[in-house]
Amino acid sequence: MNSFGIKFKISTFGESHGVAIGCLLDGVPAGLLIDEEFIQAELDRRKPGKSEFETARKEDDKVEILSGVFEGKSTGTPIAMIIYNTNQKSKDYSNIKDIFRPGHADFTYFHKYGLRDYRGGGRSSARETAARVAGGAVAKLMLKELGIEVQSGICEVDGIKSLEFDYESAKKSIIYALDSTKEEAQKEAILRAKNEHDSVGGVSRVLIKGVPVGLGQPLYYKMDAVLADAMMGINAVKAVEIGDGILSASLKGSINNDAIRADGFVTNHSGGILGGISNGEDIVMNVYFKPTPSIFKEQQTITCRDEEVDFSLKGRHDPCVAIRGTIVCEAMAALVIADMLLLNMGSEMSGVLTYYKK
C-alpha cells in the first residue's frame, strides 16, 4: 500500500533516483491556513547533506504545491505536493545491479515483484520519507489550530542513552540530541562508525502534547496500534514503545497503574493511552532504528542468480539513519493525530448536532 490514514489520508509516490517524489493529501478540511514557509522549514529539518553526521547527498528538497490550495488556504480538495530530485548519482549503484545488499529490501522486492530499481533502493529508499514530512507538516498546521504539538529528539545513539529529555535543546542540536550532556559522546560514536565505514543505530523519542481525551477506536483502530503502525512503516524502524513499553513487563501492577486524582493522572506509565484511546496526558513513544544497512565494509551476499559473492558498496549514506528519521517520526505522528481527530467528530451525537444543527 502507498496510502496511510482513513479520513486524513496521505499517498506518496516516487523513487530515490527518479525525477521526483511527492504526496497527495486527501481529507484536509477546507479553510486551513497553509503556511508554505513552515512546510519548507519542516523539510529542511529532514533534508540530507547538512552536516558530517548525515549522508553527503545534497538535495534542496524544495516543495511545490500543485493543487488544493487557493489564496493561502486549503480548498477541501486533494493537496498535491512535489519535490524534485536534483542530486542523484545512479552510477554509484551500477556494481550492485544484480546483487542483493544485506540489510536492504533488495532481496524481498526482487522476489515479490520479479524486478527492482537498484538505483539507491528505488521506492524502498528513505528518500521517499521527504514526501511524508511534507504531508506531516500540513497535519501539524491543523493540529496547531487545536493547541496540539508534536516534538521529538534523539534519546540514544549506539547505546549511549539520554538521562534527560529537553525538546527545546534538541531543536538546536545538529543531531537533535535530547540530552546536551550526552551529545558529544553520541556525535563521536557516529563519526567513529563513519570513519570505520560502518554505521550505528539510534532511538527517537516522540512527545505529543495537548491531545484531547477520547481519540482512538476501542478495538481495531486503537491509538497506540495506529501510531505503532505509522512508526513501523518508516525505513529502518525495528521496534516501538508506548509509554514505559518493555519496562512495563517487569513492573508490578501497583507501580505500573497510573493513579487518578481530581486534577488528573499522577504518573504517565501508559504514555497517554488507555484501552487504545487517548487519556489526555502526553503521548510518549520511543522509536528504535537499526544501524543504516548501507555500509562500506566488504560483505557477503548473493546475486539474483544465486551466485555467492563478496562486494563493497559505493554511494552516499547516513552513518546513523535515526538522526533524520526522528523528523519522519514527528510527521507520521502528526498524520495519525489529524486522522484520529476527524474520525472522532462523529463518535457522539452531540458532535453531529453541533456541526449540523445550526
From Swiss-Prot:
Listed InterPro entries: Chorismate_synth, Chorismate_synth_AroC_sf, Chorismate_synthase_CS
Pathway: Metabolic intermediate biosynthesis; chorismate biosynthesis; chorismate from D-erythrose 4-phosphate and phosphoenolpyruvate: step 7/7
Single GO MF annotation: FMN binding
UniProt superkingdom: Bacteria
UniProt KW keywords: Amino-acid biosynthesis, Aromatic amino acid biosynthesis, FAD, Flavoprotein, FMN, Lyase, NADP
Pfam family, one: Chorismate_synt
Catalytic activity, as annotated: 5-O-(1-carboxyvinyl)-3-phosphoshikimate = chorismate + phosphate
Record: residues binding NADP(+): 46
EC number(s) given by UniProt: 4.2.3.5
The protein's name in its UniProt record: Chorismate synthase
Organism: Sulfurimonas denitrificans (strain ATCC 33889 / DSM 1251)
Gene field: aroC
